[in-house]
Protein backbone atom coordinates (compact mmCIF):
# COMPACT_ATOMS: atom_id res chain seq x y z
CA UNK A 1 0.00 0.00 0.00
CA UNK A 2 1.11 3.57 -0.61
CA UNK A 3 1.39 5.85 2.42
CA UNK A 4 -1.70 6.75 4.41
CA UNK A 5 -0.99 10.45 3.86
CA UNK A 6 -0.91 10.06 0.08
CA UNK A 7 -4.07 7.94 0.12
CA UNK A 8 -5.82 10.62 2.15
CA UNK A 9 -4.68 13.39 -0.22
CA UNK A 10 -6.06 11.62 -3.27
CA UNK A 11 -9.24 10.27 -1.67
CA UNK A 12 -10.23 13.56 -0.01
CA UNK A 13 -9.82 15.58 -3.21
CA UNK A 14 -13.24 16.67 -4.46
CA UNK A 15 -15.35 15.07 -1.71
CA UNK A 16 -18.28 16.97 -0.21
CA UNK A 17 -17.91 15.70 3.36
CA UNK A 18 -15.61 13.32 5.21
CA UNK A 19 -17.02 12.53 8.65
CA UNK A 20 -15.14 12.44 10.98
CA UNK A 21 -11.94 13.35 9.11
CA UNK A 22 -9.51 12.49 11.93
CA UNK A 23 -11.05 9.03 12.34
CA UNK A 24 -10.67 8.36 8.64
CA UNK A 25 -6.99 9.32 8.75
CA UNK A 26 -6.48 6.90 11.65
CA UNK A 27 -8.28 4.11 9.78
CA UNK A 28 -5.95 4.62 6.80
CA UNK A 29 -2.87 4.68 9.04
CA UNK A 30 -3.92 1.44 10.74
CA UNK A 31 -4.71 -0.22 7.40
CA UNK A 32 -1.24 0.63 6.09
CA UNK A 33 0.54 -0.34 9.33
CA UNK A 34 -1.20 -3.73 9.57
CA UNK A 35 -1.53 -4.30 5.81
CA UNK A 36 -5.26 -4.83 6.38
CA UNK A 37 -7.60 -3.44 3.72
CA UNK A 38 -10.52 -1.27 4.75
CA UNK A 39 -14.04 -2.50 3.96
CA UNK A 40 -15.61 0.21 1.81
CA UNK A 41 -19.34 0.06 1.14
CA UNK A 42 -21.63 1.64 -1.42
CA UNK A 43 -25.31 0.80 -1.31
CA UNK A 44 -27.34 0.93 -4.51
CA UNK A 45 -31.12 0.88 -4.60
CA UNK A 46 -31.86 -0.74 -7.99
CA UNK A 47 -34.86 1.38 -8.92
CA UNK A 48 -33.34 3.24 -11.91
CA UNK A 49 -30.70 0.96 -13.41
CA UNK A 50 -29.43 3.15 -16.26
CA UNK A 51 -26.24 4.74 -15.00
CA UNK A 52 -25.17 8.19 -16.16
CA UNK A 53 -22.09 10.29 -15.41
CA UNK A 54 -23.68 11.60 -12.22
CA UNK A 55 -23.58 8.09 -10.76
CA UNK A 56 -19.92 7.63 -11.68
CA UNK A 57 -18.76 10.40 -9.33
CA UNK A 58 -18.83 8.00 -6.39
CA UNK A 59 -17.78 4.99 -8.49
CA UNK A 60 -14.56 6.74 -9.55
CA UNK A 61 -13.66 7.40 -5.93
CA UNK A 62 -14.35 3.75 -5.10
CA UNK A 63 -12.00 2.75 -7.92
CA UNK A 64 -9.31 4.76 -6.15
CA UNK A 65 -9.86 2.67 -3.01
CA UNK A 66 -9.47 -0.46 -5.14
CA UNK A 67 -6.22 0.86 -6.59
CA UNK A 68 -4.95 1.32 -3.03
CA UNK A 69 -5.74 -2.30 -2.16
CA UNK A 70 -8.90 -1.84 -0.11
CA UNK A 71 -11.99 -4.06 -0.29
CA UNK A 72 -14.94 -2.51 -2.12
CA UNK A 73 -18.42 -3.93 -1.58
CA UNK A 74 -21.29 -2.92 -3.83
CA UNK A 75 -24.45 -3.62 -1.88
CA UNK A 76 -27.52 -4.08 -4.03
CA UNK A 77 -30.51 -3.12 -1.91
CA UNK A 78 -32.80 -5.80 -3.28
CA UNK A 79 -34.66 -6.10 0.02
CA UNK A 80 -34.89 -2.36 0.76
CA UNK A 81 -35.98 -1.67 -2.84
CA UNK A 82 -39.21 -3.43 -1.98
CA UNK A 83 -39.83 -0.48 0.36
CA UNK A 84 -38.38 2.29 -1.79
CA UNK A 85 -35.95 4.89 -0.45
CA UNK A 86 -38.05 7.87 0.73
CA UNK A 87 -35.02 10.22 0.65
CA UNK A 88 -36.00 13.49 -0.98
CA UNK A 89 -39.48 12.26 -1.85
CA UNK A 90 -42.61 14.24 -1.06
CA UNK A 91 -44.89 11.21 -1.29
CA UNK A 92 -44.66 7.52 -0.45
CA UNK A 93 -42.96 5.55 -3.23
CA UNK A 94 -44.54 2.33 -4.50
CA UNK A 95 -42.36 -0.74 -3.88
CA UNK A 96 -40.76 -2.69 -6.71
CA UNK A 97 -41.62 -6.29 -7.49
CA UNK A 98 -38.97 -8.94 -6.90
CA UNK A 99 -38.70 -9.45 -10.67
CA UNK A 100 -38.08 -5.74 -11.27
CA UNK A 101 -35.40 -5.70 -8.58
CA UNK A 102 -33.56 -8.69 -10.08
CA UNK A 103 -33.66 -7.22 -13.61
CA UNK A 104 -32.46 -3.82 -12.45
CA UNK A 105 -29.71 -5.31 -10.27
CA UNK A 106 -28.33 -7.24 -13.25
CA UNK A 107 -28.25 -4.07 -15.35
CA UNK A 108 -26.51 -2.22 -12.51
CA UNK A 109 -23.77 -4.83 -12.30
CA UNK A 110 -23.13 -4.70 -16.05
CA UNK A 111 -22.71 -0.94 -15.93
CA UNK A 112 -20.74 -0.39 -12.71
CA UNK A 113 -17.96 -2.57 -14.06
CA UNK A 114 -17.34 0.03 -16.74
CA UNK A 115 -15.72 1.93 -13.85
CA UNK A 116 -14.89 -0.59 -11.12
CA UNK A 117 -12.55 -3.56 -11.43
CA UNK A 118 -14.82 -6.65 -11.32
CA UNK A 119 -11.96 -8.75 -9.93
CA UNK A 120 -11.68 -6.41 -6.94
CA UNK A 121 -15.38 -5.85 -6.36
CA UNK A 122 -17.62 -7.89 -4.09
CA UNK A 123 -21.32 -7.65 -4.93
CA UNK A 124 -23.74 -8.45 -2.11
CA UNK A 125 -27.52 -8.29 -1.68
CA UNK A 126 -29.04 -7.12 1.59
CA UNK A 127 -31.76 -9.76 1.42
CA UNK A 128 -28.99 -12.11 2.64
CA UNK A 129 -29.51 -10.85 6.19
CA UNK A 130 -32.61 -8.64 6.20
CA UNK A 131 -34.87 -11.45 5.00
CA UNK A 132 -33.77 -13.53 7.99
CA UNK A 133 -34.78 -11.00 10.65
CA UNK A 134 -37.85 -11.98 12.64
CA UNK A 135 -40.32 -9.55 14.21
CA UNK A 136 -38.41 -9.47 17.50
CA UNK A 137 -35.25 -8.48 15.58
CA UNK A 138 -37.15 -5.71 13.79
CA UNK A 139 -38.52 -4.33 17.07
CA UNK A 140 -35.03 -4.41 18.58
CA UNK A 141 -33.71 -2.49 15.57
CA UNK A 142 -36.56 0.04 15.79
CA UNK A 143 -35.73 0.68 19.45
CA UNK A 144 -32.32 2.07 18.48
CA UNK A 145 -33.76 5.36 17.19
CA UNK A 146 -36.57 7.74 18.09
CA UNK A 147 -39.38 9.21 16.01
CA UNK A 148 -38.23 12.69 17.05
CA UNK A 149 -34.78 12.02 15.57
CA UNK A 150 -36.31 10.57 12.41
CA UNK A 151 -38.35 13.73 11.95
CA UNK A 152 -35.15 15.77 11.96
CA UNK A 153 -34.54 14.48 8.45
CA UNK A 154 -35.50 17.22 5.99
CA UNK A 155 -37.91 15.26 3.80
CA UNK A 156 -39.72 13.63 6.73
CA UNK A 157 -39.88 16.96 8.59
CA UNK A 158 -41.35 18.73 5.56
CA UNK A 159 -44.00 16.08 4.97
CA UNK A 160 -44.90 16.02 8.68
CA UNK A 161 -45.27 19.80 8.99
CA UNK A 162 -47.31 19.94 5.77
CA UNK A 163 -49.63 17.21 7.01
CA UNK A 164 -48.71 14.74 4.29
CA UNK A 165 -48.66 11.05 5.23
CA UNK A 166 -45.51 9.17 6.22
CA UNK A 167 -45.86 5.42 6.40
CA UNK A 168 -44.25 3.59 9.34
CA UNK A 169 -42.34 1.35 6.92
CA UNK A 170 -40.57 4.43 5.51
CA UNK A 171 -38.97 5.01 8.91
CA UNK A 172 -37.56 1.51 8.61
CA UNK A 173 -35.59 2.30 5.43
CA UNK A 174 -32.71 4.24 7.07
CA UNK A 175 -32.65 1.67 9.89
CA UNK A 176 -32.28 -1.19 7.43
CA UNK A 177 -29.64 0.68 5.45
CA UNK A 178 -27.81 1.25 8.72
CA UNK A 179 -28.12 -2.43 9.61
CA UNK A 180 -26.38 -3.25 6.32
CA UNK A 181 -23.25 -1.59 7.72
CA UNK A 182 -23.43 -3.87 10.76
CA UNK A 183 -23.76 -6.97 8.58
CA UNK A 184 -20.84 -5.97 6.34
CA UNK A 185 -18.67 -4.57 9.16
CA UNK A 186 -18.10 -1.51 6.99
CA UNK A 187 -15.18 0.79 7.80
CA UNK A 188 -16.22 3.42 5.27
CA UNK A 189 -19.54 4.12 3.56
CA UNK A 190 -20.03 6.22 0.45
CA UNK A 191 -23.04 8.12 -0.79
CA UNK A 192 -24.31 11.37 -2.25
CA UNK A 193 -24.87 14.45 -0.12
CA UNK A 194 -28.59 13.63 -0.13
CA UNK A 195 -27.82 10.38 1.72
CA UNK A 196 -25.99 11.82 4.75
CA UNK A 197 -28.78 11.00 7.24
CA UNK A 198 -28.93 7.36 6.14
CA UNK A 199 -25.13 7.00 6.15
CA UNK A 200 -24.86 8.39 9.68
CA UNK A 201 -27.54 5.91 10.74
CA UNK A 202 -25.14 3.08 9.92
CA UNK A 203 -22.48 4.71 12.07
CA UNK A 204 -24.96 5.15 14.94
CA UNK A 205 -26.17 1.54 14.82
CA UNK A 206 -22.62 0.17 14.69
CA UNK A 207 -21.85 2.15 17.84
CA UNK A 208 -24.99 0.76 19.50
CA UNK A 209 -23.66 -2.73 18.78
CA UNK A 210 -20.24 -1.91 20.24
CA UNK A 211 -18.56 -2.10 16.83
CA UNK A 212 -15.97 0.30 15.36
CA UNK A 213 -18.01 3.04 13.71
CA UNK A 214 -17.75 3.62 9.96
CA UNK A 215 -16.61 6.92 8.57
CA UNK A 216 -18.76 8.67 6.00
CA UNK A 217 -17.69 10.05 2.65
CA UNK A 218 -20.24 11.96 0.61
CA UNK A 219 -19.63 13.05 -2.96
CA UNK A 220 -21.02 16.19 -4.61
CA UNK A 221 -24.13 15.99 -6.74
CA UNK A 222 -23.08 16.53 -10.37
CA UNK A 223 -24.87 19.30 -12.23
CA UNK A 224 -26.38 18.24 -15.54
CA UNK A 225 -25.83 19.65 -19.01
CA UNK A 226 -28.09 22.60 -18.19
CA UNK A 227 -25.57 23.65 -15.54
CA UNK A 228 -28.31 24.17 -12.97
CA UNK A 229 -30.16 21.04 -11.86
CA UNK A 230 -28.53 17.76 -10.88
CA UNK A 231 -27.87 15.33 -13.69
CA UNK A 232 -30.99 13.25 -14.19
CA UNK A 233 -32.42 11.08 -16.93
CA UNK A 234 -35.91 12.40 -16.22
CA UNK A 235 -34.69 15.98 -16.77
CA UNK A 236 -32.92 15.04 -19.99
CA UNK A 237 -29.70 16.78 -18.90
CA UNK A 238 -27.58 13.64 -18.64
CA UNK A 239 -24.79 11.72 -20.38
CA UNK A 240 -25.40 7.98 -20.20
CA UNK A 241 -22.28 5.83 -19.91
CA UNK A 242 -23.66 3.36 -22.47
CA UNK A 243 -24.49 5.99 -25.09
CA UNK A 244 -22.85 5.91 -28.52
CA UNK A 245 -19.44 7.66 -28.71
CA UNK A 246 -20.63 10.43 -31.04
CA UNK A 247 -23.71 11.11 -28.90
CA UNK A 248 -21.63 11.10 -25.72
CA UNK A 249 -19.04 13.44 -27.25
CA UNK A 250 -21.69 15.82 -28.58
CA UNK A 251 -23.44 16.01 -25.22
CA UNK A 252 -20.15 16.65 -23.42
CA UNK A 253 -19.49 19.59 -25.73
CA UNK A 254 -22.68 21.21 -24.42
CA UNK A 255 -21.39 21.30 -20.82
CA UNK A 256 -21.26 24.95 -19.65
CA UNK A 257 -17.73 26.39 -19.69
CA UNK A 258 -17.83 27.21 -15.98
CA UNK A 259 -18.38 23.52 -15.13
CA UNK A 260 -15.56 22.06 -17.24
CA UNK A 261 -13.01 21.81 -14.43
CA UNK A 262 -15.64 20.42 -12.05
CA UNK A 263 -16.35 17.65 -14.57
CA UNK A 264 -12.61 16.95 -14.94
CA UNK A 265 -12.40 16.60 -11.16
CA UNK A 266 -15.49 14.47 -10.60
CA UNK A 267 -15.90 12.22 -13.65
CA UNK A 268 -12.46 11.73 -15.25
CA UNK A 269 -9.15 10.11 -14.36
CA UNK A 270 -7.13 13.32 -14.79
CA UNK A 271 -4.57 13.76 -11.99
CA UNK A 272 -4.89 16.56 -9.45
CA UNK A 273 -1.70 18.13 -10.79
CA UNK A 274 -3.00 18.11 -14.37
CA UNK A 275 -6.29 19.64 -13.23
CA UNK A 276 -4.49 22.45 -11.42
CA UNK A 277 -2.30 23.22 -14.44
CA UNK A 278 -5.24 23.16 -16.84
CA UNK A 279 -7.20 25.50 -14.58
CA UNK A 280 -4.27 27.93 -14.53
CA UNK A 281 -3.98 27.75 -18.32
CA UNK A 282 -7.67 28.60 -18.68
CA UNK A 283 -7.38 31.57 -16.34
CA UNK A 284 -4.27 32.92 -18.07
CA UNK A 285 -5.65 32.43 -21.56
CA UNK A 286 -2.96 29.88 -22.45
CA UNK A 287 -5.74 27.36 -23.11
CA UNK A 288 -8.86 28.11 -25.16
CA UNK A 289 -12.16 27.00 -23.53
CA UNK A 290 -13.22 25.23 -26.76
CA UNK A 291 -10.02 23.16 -26.82
CA UNK A 292 -10.35 22.32 -23.13
CA UNK A 293 -13.94 21.22 -23.65
CA UNK A 294 -12.91 19.01 -26.57
CA UNK A 295 -10.27 17.46 -24.32
CA UNK A 296 -12.96 16.85 -21.68
CA UNK A 297 -15.34 15.28 -24.21
CA UNK A 298 -12.56 13.08 -25.62
CA UNK A 299 -11.56 11.97 -22.10
CA UNK A 300 -15.12 11.04 -21.15
CA UNK A 301 -15.67 8.99 -24.31
CA UNK A 302 -12.26 7.30 -23.94
CA UNK A 303 -13.09 6.13 -20.42
CA UNK A 304 -16.16 4.21 -21.59
CA UNK A 305 -15.44 3.33 -25.22
CA UNK A 306 -11.67 3.49 -25.69
CA UNK A 307 -9.23 5.74 -27.58
CA UNK A 308 -10.38 4.80 -31.08
CA UNK A 309 -14.03 5.51 -30.31
CA UNK A 310 -13.09 8.81 -28.67
CA UNK A 311 -11.22 9.84 -31.82
CA UNK A 312 -14.26 8.86 -33.91
CA UNK A 313 -16.58 10.87 -31.66
CA UNK A 314 -14.34 13.90 -32.00
CA UNK A 315 -14.10 13.55 -35.79
CA UNK A 316 -17.89 13.26 -36.03
CA UNK A 317 -18.35 16.36 -33.90
CA UNK A 318 -16.01 18.38 -36.11
CA UNK A 319 -17.70 17.00 -39.22
CA UNK A 320 -21.29 17.75 -38.12
CA UNK A 321 -20.96 20.85 -35.93
CA UNK A 322 -17.98 22.68 -37.37
CA UNK A 323 -18.13 21.64 -41.02
CA UNK A 324 -21.95 21.28 -41.02
CA UNK A 325 -21.83 17.92 -42.82
CA UNK A 326 -23.99 14.84 -42.21
CA UNK A 327 -22.81 12.21 -39.71
CA UNK A 328 -21.13 9.17 -41.25
CA UNK A 329 -23.22 6.70 -39.26
CA UNK A 330 -26.90 7.69 -39.25
CA UNK A 331 -29.38 5.27 -37.61
CA UNK A 332 -31.87 3.82 -40.06
CA UNK A 333 -35.61 4.01 -39.42
CA UNK A 334 -37.72 1.54 -41.36
CA UNK A 335 -41.18 2.69 -42.40
CA UNK A 336 -43.72 1.89 -45.11
CA UNK A 337 -43.31 4.53 -47.82
CA UNK A 338 -46.39 5.56 -49.83
CA UNK A 339 -47.46 8.61 -51.81
CA UNK A 340 -49.62 9.70 -48.89
CA UNK A 341 -48.22 12.45 -46.61
CA UNK A 342 -47.32 11.41 -43.06
CA UNK A 343 -47.89 13.42 -39.88
CA UNK A 344 -44.38 14.61 -38.99
CA UNK A 345 -44.85 15.12 -35.20
CA UNK A 346 -46.04 11.52 -34.82
CA UNK A 347 -43.17 10.24 -36.98
CA UNK A 348 -40.54 12.15 -35.02
CA UNK A 349 -41.99 10.94 -31.74
CA UNK A 350 -42.20 7.31 -32.90
CA UNK A 351 -38.62 7.44 -34.19
CA UNK A 352 -37.31 8.75 -30.87
CA UNK A 353 -36.17 12.11 -32.23
CA UNK A 354 -38.54 13.84 -29.83
CA UNK A 355 -40.14 12.75 -26.59
CA UNK A 356 -43.68 13.58 -27.71
CA UNK A 357 -45.82 15.01 -30.51
CA UNK A 358 -45.92 18.29 -28.64
CA UNK A 359 -42.14 18.51 -28.48
CA UNK A 360 -42.00 17.68 -32.19
CA UNK A 361 -44.40 20.52 -33.02
CA UNK A 362 -42.32 22.94 -30.96
CA UNK A 363 -39.15 21.80 -32.72
CA UNK A 364 -40.74 22.32 -36.15
CA UNK A 365 -42.03 25.76 -35.16
CA UNK A 366 -38.60 26.74 -33.80
CA UNK A 367 -36.88 25.76 -37.05
CA UNK A 368 -35.05 22.83 -35.46
CA UNK A 369 -36.45 20.23 -37.91
CA UNK A 370 -34.51 19.59 -41.12
CA UNK A 371 -34.88 17.28 -44.12
CA UNK A 372 -31.61 16.44 -45.88
CA UNK A 373 -30.00 19.43 -44.17
CA UNK A 374 -32.72 21.93 -45.13
CA UNK A 375 -35.12 23.47 -42.61
CA UNK A 376 -38.72 22.35 -42.90
CA UNK A 377 -41.73 23.86 -41.13
CA UNK A 378 -44.34 21.50 -42.58
CA UNK A 379 -46.26 19.10 -40.33
CA UNK A 380 -47.12 16.76 -43.24
CA UNK A 381 -44.53 15.43 -45.71
CA UNK A 382 -44.23 12.65 -48.28
CA UNK A 383 -41.43 10.29 -47.31
CA UNK A 384 -38.71 9.17 -49.70
CA UNK A 385 -36.29 6.27 -49.35
CA UNK A 386 -32.94 7.53 -48.01
CA UNK A 387 -34.35 10.83 -46.75
CA UNK A 388 -32.46 12.11 -43.66
CA UNK A 389 -34.54 13.70 -40.91
CA UNK A 390 -32.87 15.82 -38.25
CA UNK A 391 -34.06 17.43 -35.02
CA UNK A 392 -31.71 19.85 -33.32
CA UNK A 393 -27.97 19.43 -33.71
CA UNK A 394 -27.46 15.80 -32.71
CA UNK A 395 -30.51 13.71 -33.63
CA UNK A 396 -30.67 12.10 -37.07
CA UNK A 397 -32.46 9.19 -38.76
CA UNK A 398 -32.36 7.89 -42.32
CA UNK A 399 -35.71 6.79 -43.73
CA UNK A 400 -35.55 3.25 -45.16
CA UNK A 401 -38.45 1.60 -46.95
CA UNK A 402 -39.66 -1.64 -45.42
Q: In which residue ranges do the predicted regions lie?
A:
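Conserved nucleotide- and phosphate/pyrophosphate-binding catalytic cores
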Residues: 205-402
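Positively charged, low-complexity intrinsically disordered leader regions
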Residues: 1-39
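Short, hydrophobic/aliphatic alpha-helical segments
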Residues: 35-44, 72, 173-183, 224, ...
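Divalent-metal (Mg2+/Mn2+/Ca2+)-assisted nucleotide/phosphate chemistry catalytic cores
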Residues: 15, 95-218, 225
